[in-house]
Regions:
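Single conserved hydrophobic/aromatic residue that forms the stacking wall/gate
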Residues: 1-23
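Expand to "…catalyze enediolate/carbanion chemistry for C-C bond making/breaking, isomerization
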Residues: 25-350
Length: 350
């Protein structure tokens, strides 16, 4: 049911107006009156490499800060034993407040415990109340439905308002169960309106949820003809791109096998992912290298944009470059490459 806002716009928030417009558009799409709607990217963050750091090991915080990782999440979930959950929470709050993550070119996040645990509530309340003004995102594990995202978003709304926080914390989710994968499109669509910025492929728990036979977390099974994770990765990627959400590939368990890590990262990059987890510092530079566009690719992308700009001035929608036809679709791909390169350059300049 579409809820139309009052005819008078006085006192009506822009958010309410935007929701109404989206409801109308989706109503028209569902009934075949419109072919598509474009969701612009919700937020750009450089996320080529994503370093996981146990909250129970504060000695690793300073090393993570000085690393070349684009993104660091301090973990309260799988990497922390039950008896260490409470002290790990305290460690993480101190690390967020005392260390200059953004100043060192990092997006800083916290992976909380899942909503089916008794830890989750205190994770959110204590971390956000005490360090929310310096926290970029919260990573929610085992998201199964869009309601999971709504619950976390509602908690953040209340805490930020009660504490007067000016920083709006983003939400990222791990798709790591068959339920989450079955609902991935709905999670992306509805979650976007509830702070959702990114989805991560949690291959280890996803494998367990599928009862898949695996050898290495994120690795290939020699008995399977091809990449057994391709279907899940592709399904999640499409949901992300449909609704302007960032898509991040998950972990590769054997940090003593850099070649296989690179192969996995290249497969993700080829599909359209923006980055990959690093569960060990040795994997950071591998991810950065794979997800950094080569100079030749950046140069070619800029040439495409210049050629199409010149064609547009002449009233043409397409152009030729090096004997090949390029058009609006070429421009979109080129813009993605140039935007990523600009973000990397900006980070390096500090």
């Amino acid at each position: 049911m579409i809820r139309r806002p009052p005819r008078s716009t006085q006192g009506v928030s822009s958010a309410a107006s935007d929701v109404y417009k989206r409801q109308v558009l989706e109503y028209l799409i569902q009934r075949g009156f419109m072919s598509h709607i474009i969701y612009e990217p919700v937020k750009q963050r450089l996320q080529r490499s994503e370093l996981a750091v146990p909250g129970s090991n504060p000695k690793m915080f300073e090393k993570a800060l000085k690393s070349s990782a684009d993104y660091v999440f301090l973990d309260l979930e799988d990497a922390v034993a039950p008896d260490d959950k409470v002290p790990a929470r305290k460690n993480i709050i101190e690390a967020i407040n005392d260390l200059d993550w953004n100043g060192n070119g990092k997006t800083i996040s916290v992976r909380i415990n899942s909503i089916d645990t008794h830890y989750m509530y205190r994770d959110v309340v204590e971390v956000v109340e005490q360090a929310g003004d310096k926290l970029d995102t919260i990573l929610l594990p085992k998201a199964g439905t869009a309601s999971d995202v709504y619950m976390l978003s509602a908690m953040l709304n209340q805490i930020e308002t009660s504490k007067g926080l000016k920083n709006r914390i983003g939400i990222e989710v791990l798709i790591e169960t068959t339920l989450g994968m079955a609902n991935v499109m709905d999670i992306a669509q509805k979650g976007r309106e509830e702070r959702l910025e990114a989805m991560h492929f949690g291959v280890a728990d996803y494998a367990a949820s599928c009862r898949a036979r695996t050898t290495v977390i994120g690795g290939l099974n020699p008995d399977y003809p091809g990449d057994q994770w391709h279907a899940g990765l592709s399904q999640m990627l499409v949901a992300c791109r449909a609704y302007g959400i960032r898509a991040i590939d998950g972990p590769f368990g054997d940090f003593n096998d850099p070649e296989s890590y690179i192969d996995a990262a290249k497969r993700g990059a080829a599909l359209g992912f923006e980055g990959k987890w690093a569960i060990h510092p040795s994997q950071i530079d591998l991810a950065n290298e794979v997800y950094t566009p080569p100079e030749s690719e950046v140069s070619h992308a800029k040439q495409i944009l210049i050629a199409l700009d010149e064609a547009a001035k002449e009233g043409r929608g397409a152009a030729q470059l090096n004997g090949r036809m390029i058009d609006a679709a070429s421009a979109k791909m080129a813009e993605n490459i140039v935007n990523t390169d600009n973000a990397i350059t900006s980070k390096l300049k500090g």
